[in-house]
Amino acid sequence: MEKTDIITLMQLPDVGSKTVLKLYNHVSNRRLINLDFNDYISLIEEITNKKFMGIHIDKSKLKAEKLLEQCYLNKIKIFSFLDDDYPDRLKKIGNDKPVILFSKGNHDIMKTGYNLAFIGSRKVSKENYKIGVKFSKLAVDMGVNIVSGLAIGCDTAGHRGALLTNKNLLSGKTLAVLPSGIQNIYPKKNTTLSNEILEEEGCLISEKPPFESPEKYDYIMRDRLQAALSESIFILQSSLGSGTVHTAKFGEKYSKKIFCYGINTQNKGMELNKKLINEGKAFDINSEEQFKLAISKERDEHYEISH
């Protein structure tokens, strides 16, 4: 199955990653070979009990051509789940993996090094924001990559701290997982931050085509990628109503170690931190030194296993 076929199929009405994965499994299980695009259309119709008119197919081809051109002009790489260089971290999440992923910048962050998801609520206290920037810089200075979602609040603290690194050869980078297309940064307020990430050899990724706006469900999909692309997760500050809850759940599902900032968990906005620590689902971090020791230990163990 060629990448262009996958992209074109996904431009058809109501055809997404799950349908394409069903198609791929169907083809693999039957050991079907030498199929062309029209064969894939017929098989999708068989799988979904839908009939696509000629106009739908023609439109999907035009949309795919436009999408490929947009990516070429904006230096965006398209990963297919069948590519040899598709990130192993995403292969490991099985049917949760993106079928198509758009990436701009330093793609290697998805594939190498030790990644820490640095997350939390959009509403963050001034004190915790400063602590977040400091912790993130500490991690990157230790060669750890910071993965976050480019939202305001805790995400911004994570990215900003990463950009303050001493910039030696061993320094980590930062990767932003977007709920929107790479050329349509959301929130707009962080457009400058996204440019700085690229300038400092970081990376922007998204499942959305370059110029698309985010839908409600895209935020949850973004949260799963943050968890999948990281070896462990650090929650700076989060309420129980924050999207961070989704990332924590995906972290549990993917067997990721979770750390929570544990100071003043009785304060408003720290409810998720308190809950995860009390339930034994997260390790509490109460100081810079403790953060440094915990993350360096995780990093070293990761490299021992991978080598």
Where are these regions (language model features)?
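Short, positively charged patches
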Residues: 1-129
